[in-house]
Amino acid sequence: MSWMLDKEIKRELPKEWRGVIPTEVFLEEAEKIVKEANARDIQLRILGGLGVAFHSQEFRDFARKLGRVGTGAIEGQEYSDIDLMSYRKHRDKVKELFSDMKYAKRRATLSSAASERQIYYHPKGWFYVDVFFDKLVVANHPINFVGRLELDFPTVTVTDILLEKIQMWEAFSIKDLKDCLILLRTHSIEEKIQKETIDANYVAKLLSEDWGFWFTATTNLKKIKKFIFEIEKLGVEVGLDPRQLKNEEVLQITEKIDKLLERVEKEPKSFKWKMRAKVGTKKRWYNPVERPETVGGFGIWETLLEK
């Protein structure tokens, strides 16, 4: 791997970590990077699971009840990298930012060029940072962030984080399920742009233009609802003790899913959407994303729920 970096990096973890990088380190470093970018007039925002954590700091107990805290690719470690989004116009400035912060840049490959991203490694080899530009292209349904980064800080909006999760068809994971449950438990569904809320209008309008995205997103939401309804039986399968969740928490989540789905269905669909709907699933409706955990299936749903 060293030959792919523009400088040599040696992995040096403090002994007291015992090989596991604390969640707080990821949160602090991500915020540090984004704040430094902001000081340089660079729009740079946190994506994914770390974004969920930033937006649910007051509900870490709920995340622990779900078994989300401390679970990741490395046993006992919650996260393995930092995902960020910026604008294409800032590419050179982003490169300069990470160079000044002593990160090592991974040399461009066909894969990184095609996915419109830059990859940087922590000065002490703790983790890598994935920076995407304008769009999240490495996705079953690419998401456009142009004009969206100014709406929140230090992360993308809660709405966009939820869309990141429910756009997955091939490899929807246990972590993604739990992140969705956290987002839905801790944020209200509103029909307007407002911080710390899920903008049902934006979701509905976006999905009304793309039948494939609509099908994947609504299927995921319905399966999340089915999971939470059958949590007594299915919870153990994902490392979740059903007794940890209160009935009102389950009810809150299901009501929010219903509200979001209702708004999505109410939105008038475009001509393009209607034409694609006639073809349905006879033709592939998502972009395949090749990665180790992707095997062409529907992630955890294949083992948890009946199709």
Model-derived regions, located:
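Acidic active-site catalytic centers that drive phospho-/nucleotidyl reactions
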Residues: 81-83, 130, 179
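Internal, well-ordered alpha-helical segments in soluble enzyme and binding-protein domains
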Residues: 90, 127, 176-179
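Conserved catalytic core of two-metal-ion nucleotidyltransferases
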Residues: 95-140
